[in-house]
């Protein structure tokens, strides 16, 4: 139920009011969610001199109170005491996080995974490209669309690096800071940069994609940016990034299995996706360690940050993705990923479950406030709730007997794919 409607309900009951079903109310975004706002004509009151506008005013007061409370909590994460926790962690980052970066000389490069004329020579390069195109021809369009979504996500790296540099106490303020935090961000970004490069290069060589349209999608996504909520809080930023690193590792790993020897036989693409997935797992380990350390140092604030991020749902950073035509493209991409098996609701649930176990959330007790205990319990119970929601959604879909629709995707020369939208 919409937040404002929930807040207004107890007061409405006391005044013997009921919703006016003949009236509609606009919706807007509140605290990161779509919320139905109550207009003065939304409620009909009997046996009371109180008007609908009074109820609307009371609901607005409740919303304002919630907003003030939430703003105050977010400000607490930027207090000197909280930021000092991150500052004090720097020697630990030097010892336990920076070693997860590989030396440049030992790191793979895109040319290691795809045909390289410097190694193969002219004729060998052309022969290798012909073989790559032959294998790529067997990959179905559904997986190609999911591959574009994965690649566009990786190519929006400038957005992610700038977001991390805005995080208090850890950002690279000069662009060349010598702190352990700043060196981690730059090193992580340098390794991530290869992911979009190698996927882009494969797609170009395969001949299966309209690269101009794909490149425009990347351009649009970087231009649109990414609103981080809450902004600048290191606690929330690291929870989000830990989740995202595992999610991308899962998506690339699933893609590798689906297109590989046991799937559609594209060994080159399977190798590319598998290599990227391994990188993402290593990066996930870094961010997971950071959150674990925060939970040790400040368990109450840490677990409340985890709960806040999960309550809102951890959306993929490609949510503003656009092909310049469809307003619902992201919903289509999410549904296609579910159909293809590259990233599913079950994957999301498994990620939550894994992180809850990795961070030993269930064991948190000492130092927790009442709110902290409620946050802990919410996080621990969430995987089961997600599974129940998935089951109910499936039951509703079966009852509704919805049929998939066929839509053209300009990334693959407007070939049609079937998608089942919610």
UniProtKB/Swiss-Prot annotation:
GO terms for cellular component: chloroplast stroma. Pfam families: FA_desaturase_2. Pathway: Lipid metabolism; fatty acid metabolism. Its main location: plastid. PANTHER family: ACYL- ACYL-CARRIER-PROTEIN DESATURASE-RELATED, ACYL-[ACYL-CARRIER-PROTEIN] DESATURASE 6, CHLOROPLASTIC. Belongs to the fatty acid desaturase type 2 family. This is Acyl-[acyl-carrier-protein] desaturase 6, chloroplastic.
């Amino acid at each position: 139920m919409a937040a404002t409607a929930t807040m207004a309900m107890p007061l409405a009951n006391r005044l013997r009011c009921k919703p006016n079903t003949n009236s509609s109310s606009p919706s807007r975004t509140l605290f990161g969610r779509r919320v139905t706002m109550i207009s003065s004509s939304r409620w009909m009151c009997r046996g009371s001199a109180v008007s609908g506008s009074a109820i609307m005013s009371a609901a607005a007061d409740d919303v304002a109170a919630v907003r003030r409370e939430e703003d105050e909590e977010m400000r607490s994460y930027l207090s000197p005491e909280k930021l000092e926790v991150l500052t004090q962690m720097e020697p630990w980052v030097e010892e336990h996080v920076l070693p997860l970066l590989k030396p440049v000389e030992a790191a793979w490069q895109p040319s290691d995974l795809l045909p390289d004329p410097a190694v193969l020579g002219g004729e060998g390069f052309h022969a290798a490209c012909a073989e790559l195109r032959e294998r790529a021809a067997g990959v179905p369009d559904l997986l190609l669309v999911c591959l574009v979504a994965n690649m566009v996500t990786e190519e929006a790296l400038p957005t992610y690096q700038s977001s991390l540099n805005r995080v208090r106490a850890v950002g690279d303020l000069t662009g060349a800071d010598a702190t352990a935090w700043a060196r981690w961000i730059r090193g992580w970004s340098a390794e991530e940069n290869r992911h979009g490069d190698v996927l882009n290069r494969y797609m170009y060589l395969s001949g299966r994609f309209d690269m101009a349209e794909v490149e425009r999608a990347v351009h649009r996504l970087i231009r649109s940016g990414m609103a981080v909520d809450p902004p600048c809080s290191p606690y929330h930023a690291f929870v989000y990034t830990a989740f995202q690193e595992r999610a991308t590792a899962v998506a690339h790993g699933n893609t590798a299995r689906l297109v590989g020897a046991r799937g559609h036989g594209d060994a080159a693409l399977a190798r590319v996706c598998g290599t990227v997935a391994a990188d993402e797992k290593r990066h996930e380990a870094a961010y997971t360690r950071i959150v674990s350390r925060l939970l040790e140092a400040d368990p109450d604030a840490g677990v409340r940050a985890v709960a806040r991020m999960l309550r809102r749902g951890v959306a993929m950073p490609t949510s503003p993705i656009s092909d310049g035509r469809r307003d619902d493209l992201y919903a289509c991409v999410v549904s296609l990923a579910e159909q293809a098996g590259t990233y599913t609701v079950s994957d999301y649930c498994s990620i939550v479950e894994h992180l809850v176990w990795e961070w030993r959330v269930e064991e948190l007790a000492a130092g927790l406030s009442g709110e902290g205990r409620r946050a802990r319990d919410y996080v621990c119970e969430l995987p089961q709730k997600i599974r129940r929601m998935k089951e109910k959604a499936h039951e509703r879909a079966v009852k509704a007997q919805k049929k998939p629709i066929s839509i053209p995707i300009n990334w693959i020369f407007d070939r049609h794919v079937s998608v089942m939208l919610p």
